[in-house]
A protein has these predicted regions:
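Catalytic phosphate/metal-binding cores of nucleic-acid and nucleotide-processing enzymes, i.e., regions
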Residues: 1-116
Length: 116
């Protein structure tokens, strides 16, 4: 049986997936696999693959969330024999806000890589 927090997290993932699809992205939730987790969602936009780690928590621990996203993107790439690890993002639910107002977290190095 899933606890209340687990249900909230699952609902957030479903809501984000539906919103991304509405915006024209290909988005699929990924199956949980313990230490080999590959992220919460894979998203394909304009042929580019991205891994999302979604968080619906009151306490934000960004370094922990970021490490988790990086490890899981690597797991995703390894499981599929990809030569390149997809960019990953942390998507954090904002309290009392709609899905399109969720925060998207990345580091500066990744941001500049995308812009070049």
């Amino acid at each position: 049986m899933v606890n209340k927090n687990g249900r909230k997290g699952s609902q957030f993932e479903t809501d984000v997936m539906k919103w991304l699809r509405k915006m024209g992205a290909i988005a699929e939730r990924l199956t949980k696999a313990g230490a080999k987790d590959e992220g919460d969602m894979v998203v394909i936009i304009s042929g580019e693959t991205y891994i999302l780690e979604l968080k619906n928590r009151q306490t934000l621990t960004l370094p922990e969330f970021w490490r988790e996203a990086q490890v899981e993107a690597l797991n995703y790439a390894k499981a599929r024999g990809l030569g390149e690890v997809p960019l990953s993002y942390v998507v954090v639910k904002r309290r009392n806000a709609s899905i399109d107002q969720a925060w998207v977290i990345q580091d500066l190095a990744q941001w500049i890589k995308e812009k070049q």
